[in-house]
Amino acid sequence: MSTIEERVKKIVAEQLGVKEEEVTNSASFVEDLGADSLDTVELVMALEEEFETEIPDEQAEKITTVQEAIDYVTAHAQ
């Protein structure tokens, strides 16, 4: 079983079409990885599915970097 961090990074790479090595913890989805608003919505949906959790819209808007996604999932995943 891979760690939450590894799983989040794999999902980010797949959803945004970037190489996994480009997905650093400090990477911004929009500024560093080229995501647009639709990409970020799809990314949140993929994270919800992978970790069987719901991310409310007001929380999803605050998740702008890989580390923020890891932190949220770590705190809320089942």
UniProtKB/Swiss-Prot annotation:
GO MF assignments: acyl binding; acyl carrier activity; phosphopantetheine binding
A single cellular component GO annotation: membrane
InterPro entries in the cross-refs: ACP (IPR003231), ACP-like_sf (IPR036736), PKS_PP-bd (IPR020806), PP-bd_ACP (IPR009081), Ppantetheine_attach_site (IPR006162)
Annotated Pfam families: PP-binding
GO biological process terms on file: lipid A biosynthetic process
Subcellular localization(s) per the UniProt record: Cytoplasm
Keywords: Cytoplasm, Fatty acid biosynthesis, Fatty acid metabolism, Lipid biosynthesis, Lipid metabolism, Phosphopantetheine, Phosphoprotein
Primary location class: cytoplasm
Protein modification: 4'-phosphopantetheine is transferred from CoA to a specific serine of apo-ACP by AcpS. This modification is essential for activity because fatty acids are bound in thioester linkage to the sulfhydryl of the prosthetic group.
Biochemical pathway: Lipid metabolism; fatty acid biosynthesis
Record-listed O-(pantetheine 4'-phosphoryl)serine modification sites: 37
Record-annotated Carrier domain positions: 2-77
Described function: Carrier of the growing fatty acid chain in fatty acid biosynthesis.
PANTHER family (alphabetical): ACYL CARRIER PROTEIN, CARRIER DOMAIN-CONTAINING PROTEIN
Family of the protein in this entry: Belongs to the acyl carrier protein (ACP) family.
Name of this chain's protein: Acyl carrier protein
Gene behind the chain: acpP
